[in-house]
Amino acid sequence: MPLVYSYNSNKGRKEKNEDAIAVMKNKQGEVLAVVCDGVGSHSNAAYSSNYIVTTLEKEWQNLTFANFNNMKNWLCDKIEKLNLELFNKSQEKNKKMGTTIVTVATFDNQVVVYNIGDSSAYGLTKDNEISVVTVEDSFVGALISAGAITQEEAKTHPERHVLTQALATRDNINLHTFIDDLSKYDYFLLCSDGLTNMIENEEIQDIVRNNELSISVEKLIELCVNRGGVDNISVAIIKNLGGVNHD
């Protein structure tokens, strides 16, 4: 399935950017997008996020897969191995590490989304719907799931940044998985919580559907910055062309 993409990251009003982001193709032209948001309370947050993204980017570009299951199993195993690698490194050096992760990967007409933490992926369908396809590993995410608070209340909750799960913080992880037919979607959008905490789903839909990809990315980031930009903001958008592939 032919895909094009654009992505960028902005440190917002923070002193440094602890997000890491990349979108790349393998030798078969299949796309992997990844966003990692280093856990700010950990001293090696930026190292954790950059290490994950750089490693996945380097390895994906040189791979070919026999089928969708082969691809998704490789990616799942790789994320779990990277988690253990960073966790062991943090124990050996007595340095705290931690990062969220969200990935979107394609093969033929199928897509798989993996996530840990509170970085998100949205699917914009051909029926003009938008939905979050990730599971939020946070204290407020658990409250939302339990029906204790609403999505709107979560945005101002005093413990909204408390994660219940992140990479590199323990030796085993519960990787959330979403699988669907790629043909149902016009776009996938990945982002750190610097975007999700500052913008509504309807605004994402309006901007993405009415602009070129690179302009959409910049407009989304600019909107968040103008609203305070208190966190790093990273956005990647993948567009399903349904025609001839273009880089």
Where are these regions (language model features)?
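PP2C/PPM-type serine/threonine phosphatase catalytic domain
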Residues: 1-247
